[in-house]
From Swiss-Prot:
It comes from Arabidopsis thaliana (Mouse-ear cress). Its main location: plastid. Residues 35-105 are annotated as: Disordered. The gene is LPA2. Residues 47-75 have a biased composition (Low complexity). It comes from the Eukaryota. InterPro entries: LPA2-like. The chain crosses the membrane at residues 115-135, 152-172. This is Protein LPA2. It is found in: Plastid, Chloroplast membrane.
Amino acid sequence: MALQIHSPCSFSTRPYHLFFTTRNPRFAIKCQNSQIESDTTEDPSRSKNSSSSGVGFGSPASSSSPAKKLSAATSGNKKGKGKREVNRRAPVEKPVFMSEEGAAKAEEQRQNENAFLLTWLGLGIVILIEGIILAASGFLPEELDKLFVKYVYPVFTPSVVLFVAGTTAYGVLKYIQNEKMKGQE
């Protein structure tokens, strides 16, 4: 009694045979909605007018009587290109929020805020330069390294703490100001 084993070498040399199927699936789609079937049997000119109304899906105007639409379309064709009604909106006006005194106060506040932000930008640049100097001091000669460690290192940490605290305070202040403005509107 001999046991026959099929050699897998034909499959291993040609792996594209593993997933190859010769059966082609065929699908048939049938409509089960009687309303769609009745629409296709109706007059094609009537369905063209109702679909070209341009109103949109599910709007009451699209489901209104097609006879009115048909008569309006034919009467419009008889008149030709007549005058059409144009509805114009009023131009958008800028609201007047504050008086001259309020405008001067807002301008002064804007200038103060710009000065503060420029100062804060300068402090950030100083912190960046201090950090680069401290990072590079290990590669410099011993005398410069001692000089930077003596003068720059003690100033670096407090300046970073000041920058973070000031930035946080500025953010909270601006948030409170925005909330007040929203409350006034």
